[in-house]
């Protein structure tokens, strides 16, 4: 779905220019043009495993399955700073209940998948398209939430694999994290998207805890407890950074620093998104979203 017309020497491909709109609107245009029963979404900075579609489509043999997909892992050729970003997202204390989006885990039903690796029944997508595509990022959360009503299934299969190039640490990675935090704060205020909503408020609490710790170290009676809490957190992120860096073949110091900054930036973004109660309004106006 390019912005402008594109000519390809392949008669099997149907290219539909969408105009300068965000990815959520591009998906809606594609769904309205095609007559296929199943829509497959992937990002332009991702590429699929050769068996991606076969491993995902097989789940739709069950009529109760409405959405299927798998992880978007870090490509082996990414730069060291990109691999550090992938390791940060692979950390259990960063992505928590959404970790399956970034690493291969066991097959199971989940409450949400990332739109960079997501297949959905076309009728289910179109039924709620206007509601879910109002937001970006975050439209994949609403899509899965709406699609999985009335006992429908969202299936995660590690064999339905795509490779997703990461944003290099620290600038590009943290800008992405800020955007994620903003939409999560907005959703926490306006919408209940899953039973895991409380987990997403933890980084915001972490930011507020920084303020409390700074206040505590100025008080002799609380100074010991403040140092103990800071030491426990440092040990936790150190352990997690080493595990993630080893698994993703990334620089542990970049991962350690990145986990800490990701917690701060995501938490601050969550607070701002919740306080403003809006979802990137300037960008929506710019793109007609």
Spans of features found by a protein language model:
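Glycine-rich, basic loop-to-helix element that forms the pyrophosphate-binding segment
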Residues: 18-34, 55, 104, 108
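Conserved nucleotide-sugar donor-binding
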Residues: 35-36, 114-127
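A recurrent flexible, glycine/aromatic-enriched loop bordering the glycosyltransferase active site
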Residues: 74, 95-119, 134-136, 142, ...
């Amino acid at each position: 779905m390019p912005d402008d017309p594109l000519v390809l020497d392949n008669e099997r491909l149907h290219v539909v220019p969408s105009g300068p709109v965000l990815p959520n609107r591009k998906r809606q245009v594609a769904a309205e043009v095609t007559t296929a029963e199943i829509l497959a979404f992937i990002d332009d900075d991702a590429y699929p495993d050769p068996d991606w579609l076969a491993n995902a489509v097989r789940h739709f043999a069950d009529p109760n399955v409405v959405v299927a997909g798998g992880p978007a892992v870090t490509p082996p050729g990414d730069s060291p700073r990109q691999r550090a970003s992938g390791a940060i997202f692979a950390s259990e204390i960063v992505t928590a209940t959404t970790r399956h989006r970034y690493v291969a885990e066991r097959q199971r039903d989940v409450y949400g998948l990332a739109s960079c690796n997501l297949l959905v029944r076309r009728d289910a997508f179109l039924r709620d398209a206007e509601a879910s595509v109002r937001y970006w990022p975050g439209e994949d959360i609403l899509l899965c939430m709406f699609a999985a009503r009335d006992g429908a299934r969202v299936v995660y299969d590690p064999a339905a694999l795509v490779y997703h190039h990461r944003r290099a640490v620290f600038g590009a990675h943290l800008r992405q994290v800020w955007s994620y935090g903003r939409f999560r704060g907005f959703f926490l205020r306006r919408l209940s998207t899953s039973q895991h909503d409380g987990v997403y408020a933890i980084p915001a609490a972490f930011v507020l805890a920084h303020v409390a710790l700074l206040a505590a170290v100025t008080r002799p009676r609380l100074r010991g407890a403040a140092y103990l809490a800071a030491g426990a957190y440092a040990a936790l992120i150190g352990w997690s950074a080493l595990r993630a860096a080893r698994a993703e073949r990334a620089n542990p110091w970049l991962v350690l620093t990145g986990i800490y900054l990701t917690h701060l930036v995501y938490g601050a973004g969550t607070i701002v998104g919740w306080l403003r109660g809006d979802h990137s309004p300037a960008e929506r106006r710019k793109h007609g979203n």
